[in-house]
Structure formats: structure tokens, C-alpha cells
């Protein structure tokens, strides 16, 4: 049940609109009634939604094709204070090889294969709980990173994303999640298992 709450909450966080890249951190935007509080930190956007949730905040990076203006890759990372765990949602375009999953790669880290959970008309999604070691590896990497997807024809495609501001955005998101989270009480619920490298 904890896994369903975790996945449901992260999926809900991804319903907000896309963002563009920015160069400098910005003060939180004043939130209109029912709208998320937004704070730009380099290439990441920290969002907190005005909902009673075990994880009302996430950090997001969405990259669009400049020519077609279609989303190429979106990454959302949320933190669940009551579980001391993270959840990740990665959205990629359709026409990928579902069985091959995807990987996240940096200069010092390569994730295990992450399996897709679902697809809709907007793309395919990896949605899962991850261990803190994956987040720490992303935070300690220098330079850029990429999501590596595979097509049905066997070709792989690296979709680049930025780690600029990752650590600062992560720390800000975790602090806000701890301050705003409304724990869900569950008797003896174990945290979802994270993939092993």
C-alpha cells in the first residue's frame, strides 16, 4: 500500500505545467489559491502543492525540443519524510522499447535498468521509489547527465539533462517537504524496495 501511495503522489505532482531552463535561482513565486509554490534554482524547479500529502513537494526539470516544442524528457524527484525515501518519475517520448527500460548516467554513476510503469498519449513513465544512494550519486556528479532510452530497432538515445543546481534544489525540496508533509498513518508498513545496481 505504501508503494501505491508513493507512486500516486509522485504521479499527482507531475500534473503541473512544464518549465523552461533558467540561469539563476529565484525567490519563491507567490502561489495563487490552489496553485503550487514555485522556486527556480538554476536548472531545477522546486514545487510545493497546497495539498495534505506525505510528500507535497518535488523538484522538476523538463526539457523540450526547441524546434517542435514537444517534451523530450521530464524528471521529477520527491521526498517522503515519513519513509526517509525518494520517489522518481521520468517521462520520455513514445516509441521506445518498453522491455529495455531506461538508465540514468552521469560521469560517475550509472543506474540499474529502470522499468517503465505506464504509457499514455504524452509518453512513457518510470515511476518508482529509489534509495538515497541514487540521489547522493546524482548530487555528487559533476557536469551533465543523461537518460538513456532504447528504441524498438535496438538503437539507444541519450537524452541530456542538467545537474546544475541539483544539490541546492534537492536540499530546498527536502526541507520544504519535511515542513509541509502530512504523514499517512499505516500500521507496520514497510518502505518499498529500491532497485539494486
PLM region descriptions:
Residues 1, 18-20:
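Intrinsic low-complexity/disordered segments
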Residues 1-9:
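Bacterial N-terminal signal peptides that target proteins for export
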Residues 22-197:
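A generic "folded-domain core" signal
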Residues 8-17:
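Bacterial N-terminal signal peptides
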Amino acid at each position: 500500500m505504501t508503494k501505491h501511495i508513493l507512486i500516486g503522489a509522485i504521479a499527482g505532482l507531475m500534473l503541473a505545467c512544464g518549465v523552461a531552463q533558467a540561469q539563476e535561482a529565484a525567490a519563491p513565486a507567490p502561489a495563487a489559491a490552489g496553485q503550487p509554490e514555485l522556486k527556480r534554482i538554476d536548472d531545477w524547479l522546486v514545487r510545493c502543492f497546497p495539498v495534505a500529502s506525505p510528500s507535497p513537494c518535488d523538484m522538476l526539470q523538463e526539457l523540450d525540443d526547441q524546434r517542435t516544442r514537444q517534451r523530450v524528457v521530464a524528471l521529477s524527484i520527491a521526498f517522503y519524510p515519513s519513509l526517509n525515501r525518494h520517489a522518481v518519475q521520468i517521462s520520455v517520448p513514445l516509441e521506445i522499447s518498453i522491455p529495455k527500460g531506461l538508465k540514468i548516467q552521469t560521469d560517475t554513476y550509472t543506474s540499474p535498468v529502470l522499468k517503465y510503469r505506464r504509457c499514455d498519449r504524452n509518453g512513457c513513465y518510470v515511476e518508482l521509489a529509489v534509495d538515497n544512494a541514487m540521489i547522493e550519486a546524482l548530487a555528487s556528479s559533476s557536469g551533465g547527465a543523461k537518460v538513456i532510452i532504447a528504441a524498438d530497432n535496438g538503437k539507444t538515445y541519450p537524452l541530456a539533462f542538467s545537474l546544475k543546481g541539483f544539490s541546492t534544489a534537492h536540499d530546498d525540496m527536502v526541507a520544504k517537504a519535511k515542513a509541509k508533509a502530512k504523514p499517512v498513518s499505516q500500521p507496520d508498513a514497510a518502505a518499498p524496495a529500491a532497485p539494486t545496481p
